């Protein structure tokens, strides 16, 4: 004879792996060409001078230099540039 009532099942208990998004190199930091600066979904940050954009909207350095964050334009967009 069972001494515990049968437990029900649940349909919860899953979660997706984190995607490690965000800023990888901050303002004033030195970078080498090819270094990833930001991993993002969509263009939260836009590519400025000497910054390339990947097909998943990742921003990366096109040349060696220092990272510079700036807000400009009528819509106050955030741009990331590399200063040599």
UniProtKB/Swiss-Prot annotation:
Keyword Ribonucleoprotein among UniProt keywords: yes
Keyword Transcription regulation on entry: no
A Pfam family annotated for this UniProt entry: Ribosomal_L27
S-S bridge residues: none
GO molecular function list: structural constituent of ribosome
One cellular component (GO) term of this entry: cytosolic large ribosomal subunit
InterPro entries assigned to the protein according to its UniProt record, in alphabetical order: Ribosomal_bL27 (IPR001684), Ribosomal_bL27_CS (IPR018261)
Gene3D superfamilies to which the protein is assigned, alphabetical: 2.40.50.100
One GO term (biological process): translation
NCBIfam families: L27 (TIGR00062)
Name of protein: Large ribosomal subunit protein bL27
């Amino acid at each position: 004879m069972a001494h515990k009532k049968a437990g029900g099942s649940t349909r919860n208990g899953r979660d997706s792996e984190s995607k490690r998004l965000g800023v990888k190199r901050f303002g004033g930091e030195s970078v080498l060409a090819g270094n990833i600066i930001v991993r993002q979904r969509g263009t939260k940050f836009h590519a400025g001078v000497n910054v390339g954009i990947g097909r998943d909207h990742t921003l990366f350095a096109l040349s060696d230099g220092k990272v510079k964050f700036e807000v400009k334009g009528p819509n106050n967009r955030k741009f990331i540039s590399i200063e040599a």
